[in-house]
């Protein structure tokens, strides 16, 4: 996997509400996504775009800041993309909602140049095309959008994380094959309760890199779920050191604690260290 922004806990904030947006930008989330889509009424789209552009320019760079634009099929998308293109390196990425095809991302990339993208997959067609979507240029992550996808599938909002396993696995495998991040979408509730924590621990155990949250009080639990334990980090460092020592000695194989170390073990160790910002 390439060197990507850490996204254990990603807080989404309405782009039309300056107070909430500023609170999000002052939070300890790994990334803040300022939303121009679902959280903004049609009459407020232009004002929200101007506000978000100003907030991104004024951000101090201490955390990743991305923007969720309106869907490409809407009358606001072109202006959203143009505004994001003007933000340049102060913007971490653009989240493209309702991504259904590789072409959707290519069209977005053509409009914004070098700005990185994230694909929010929230339709059955998007799930069907997840492999092609994940291979798009300039793409850092794919995200599952449960609310819209669940509605399209006729799935109950009370469905447990386990009921989404087939889709979660498809997104995860596609992301890993493309060398990008798999991010779990928001839990459909704002409480930091047992149900939310279970949803985070479930996708963390599957192998996802992080989770969107819709309330600041969920940040700590989400970050904790996607942060390796100290013991896991120590073991990963020992694995990497053992492999480096074996290579320096010209040995074809490495051992640690009586176990042979292969490339699969090395990949897992590097992923653990990447999750804590290590090398």
Residues of each region from the PLM?
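Expand to "…catalyze enediolate/carbanion chemistry for C-C bond making/breaking, isomerization
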Residues: 1-279
């Amino acid at each position: 996997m390439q060197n990507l922004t850490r996204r254990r806990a990603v807080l989404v904030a309405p782009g039309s509400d300056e107070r909430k947006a500023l609170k999000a930008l002052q939070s300890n989330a790994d990334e803040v996504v300022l939303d121009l889509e679902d959280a903004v009424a049609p009459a407020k789209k232009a004002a929200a775009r101007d506000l978000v552009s100003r907030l991104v320019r004024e951000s101090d760079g201490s955390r990743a800041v991305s923007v969720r634009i309106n869907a490409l099929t809407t009358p606001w998308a072109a202006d959203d993309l143009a505004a994001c293109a003007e933000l340049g390196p102060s913007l971490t990425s653009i989240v493209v909602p309702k991504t259904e095809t590789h072409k959707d991302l290519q069209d977005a990339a053509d409009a914004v140049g070098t700005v990185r993208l994230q694909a929010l997959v929230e339709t059955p067609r998007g799930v069907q095309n997840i492999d092609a979507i994940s291979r798009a240029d300039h793409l850092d992550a794919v995200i599952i959008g449960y609310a819209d996808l669940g509605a399209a599938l006729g799935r109950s909002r009370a469905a447990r994380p386990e009921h989404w396993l087939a889709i979660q696995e498809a997104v995860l495998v596609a992301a890993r094959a493309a060398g990008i991040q798999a991010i779990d979408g928001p839990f459909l509730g704002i409480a930091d309760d047992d149900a939310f924590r279970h949803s985070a621990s479930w996708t963390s155990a599957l192998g996802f890199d992080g989770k969107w949250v819709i309330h600041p009080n969920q940040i700590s639990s989400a970050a904790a779920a996607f942060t390796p334990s100290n013991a896991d980090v120590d073991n990963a460092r020992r694995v990497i050191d053992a492999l480096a020592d074996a290579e320096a000695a010209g040995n074809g194989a490495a051992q640690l604690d009586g176990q042979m170390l292969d490339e699969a073990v090395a990949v897992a160790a590097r992923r653990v260290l990447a999750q804590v910002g290590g090398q």
